[in-house]
Amino acid sequence: MRELIRLVSSAGTGHFYTTDKNKRTKPEKIEIKKYDPVVRQHVIYKEAKIK
């Protein structure tokens, strides 16, 4: 059961990525380091629900 999620930048720029994850095997929230083009550096992105 894969669900769409949104990865929101912790830098506060409003930039986000969308992806999906398997809620059955990974029930915890995702935190991953990705590139934020607004601040032009790698920052931590945290999982949020798609509205």
Swiss-Prot record:
Cellular component GO terms held in the UniProt record: cytosolic large ribosomal subunit
BP term (GO), one: translation
InterPro entries named among the record's database cross-references: Ribosomal_bL33, Ribosomal_bL33_CS, Ribosomal_bL33_sf, Ribosomal_zn-bd
Pfam families documented for this protein: Ribosomal_L33
The entry's keywords: Ribonucleoprotein, Ribosomal protein, RNA-binding, tRNA-binding
GO molecular function, one term: tRNA binding
SUPFAM superfamilies on file: Zn-binding ribosomal proteins (SSF57829)
Coiled-coil annotated spans: none
Family: Belongs to the bacterial ribosomal protein bL33 family.
Misc. comment: Surface exposed on the 50S subunit.
Oligomeric and partner information: Part of the 50S ribosomal subunit. Cross-links to the P and E site tRNAs.
Name this protein carries in UniProt: Large ribosomal subunit protein bL33
Source species: Pseudomonas aeruginosa (strain ATCC 15692 / DSM 22644 / CIP 104116 / JCM 14847 / LMG 12228 / 1C / PRS 101 / PAO1)
Lineage: Bacteria, Pseudomonadati, Pseudomonadota, Gammaproteobacteria, Pseudomonadales
